[in-house]
């Protein structure tokens, strides 16, 4: 364990954002060729994609920063994983995604600060669930401004929703994401930190805080509008 442990309570998973920069990301899919077509990533091949993802990462993350990667780190074996990890800045915590499971017993997993199926952390006084998948519901979500957050990946959502492509027998077919219709049911305190949703770059704790605050404000406005509409209907 490195110097970063000074800012990390191992038992309670508490971090102090005034002493260390904290970032979140997910679904980098290093060396995964099909992900370029599936998610319409703007890269010609995996070499170009991997270089961009690593450069974007290191443009915001310094060697002493903390990064929580919420799964589906890379596609491939030890050569791919070790090469990518040797180039990335920061102390990385890995939440396992569905594509990471086969790598659990590999030696390069020790290069992460910690590896887990999920984590529950505090940054300052903010409680945060970290998972690869979005939750339908979770403890602490109904506390208003003090609600716990849940950060996730997996769904490859994008700020400007697009249709995804699937490859079947060499043919490319346009379809809607199987997860897309469900994302509207997320709480305003949930956010997809995956690279496809964040300009292929890790997002900082401060950025996530700003995004979730904005989502909460929108949610509040929508509820107030619904209540006004409901009142108007009842008077007719």
Which ranges hold each PLM region?
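A short, conserved beta-to-alpha structural element at the edge of catalytic cores
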Residues: 1, 45-60, 90-107, 179-213
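Acidic, histidine-bearing metal-coordination/catalytic regions of metal-dependent phosphoesterases
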Residues: 1-44, 186-236
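A short linear-motif detector with a strong N-terminal bias
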Residues: 1-4, 46-48, 72-74, 108-109, ...
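Generic detector of leucine side chains in alpha-helical contexts
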Residues: 12-13, 53, 70, 85-88, ...
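Core catalytic region of metal-dependent phosphoesterases/phosphodiesterases
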Residues: 15, 23-25, 30-123
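Short hydrophobic "helix-edge" motifs at membrane interfaces and signal-peptide entry regions
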Residues: 16-18, 87, 143-145
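Conserved beta-sheet core of the metallophosphoesterase superfamily
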Residues: 110-222, 228
């Amino acid at each position: 364990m490195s110097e970063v442990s000074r800012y990390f309570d191992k038992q309670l998973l508490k971090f102090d954002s005034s002493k260390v920069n904290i970032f979140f990301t997910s679904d980098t899919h290093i060396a995964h060729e099909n992900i370029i077509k599936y998610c319409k990533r703007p890269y010609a091949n995996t070499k170009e994609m991997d270089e961009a993802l690593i450069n974007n990462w290191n443009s915001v993350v310094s060697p002493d920063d903390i990064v929580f990667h919420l799964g589906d780190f890379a596609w491939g074996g030890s050569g791919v994983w070790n090469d990518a990890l040797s180039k990335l800045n920061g102390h990385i915590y890995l939440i396992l995604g569905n594509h990471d499971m086969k790598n659990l017993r590999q030696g390069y997993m020790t290069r992460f600060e910690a590896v887990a199926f999920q984590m529950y952390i505090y940054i300052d006084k903010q409680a945060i669930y970290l998972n690869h998948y979005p939750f339908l519901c979770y403890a602490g979500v109904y506390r208003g401004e003090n609600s716990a957050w849940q950060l996730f990946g997996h769904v490859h959502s994008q700020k400007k929703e697009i249709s995804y492509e699937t490859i079947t027998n060499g043919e490319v077919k346009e379809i809607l994401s199987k997860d897309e219709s469900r994302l509207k049911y997320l709480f305003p305190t949930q956010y997809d930190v995956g690279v496809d949703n964040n300009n292929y770059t890790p997002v900082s704790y401060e950025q996530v805080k700003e995004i979730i605050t904005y989502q909460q404000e929108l949610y509040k406005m929508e509820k107030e509008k619904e209540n006004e509409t409901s009142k108007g209907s009842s008077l007719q």
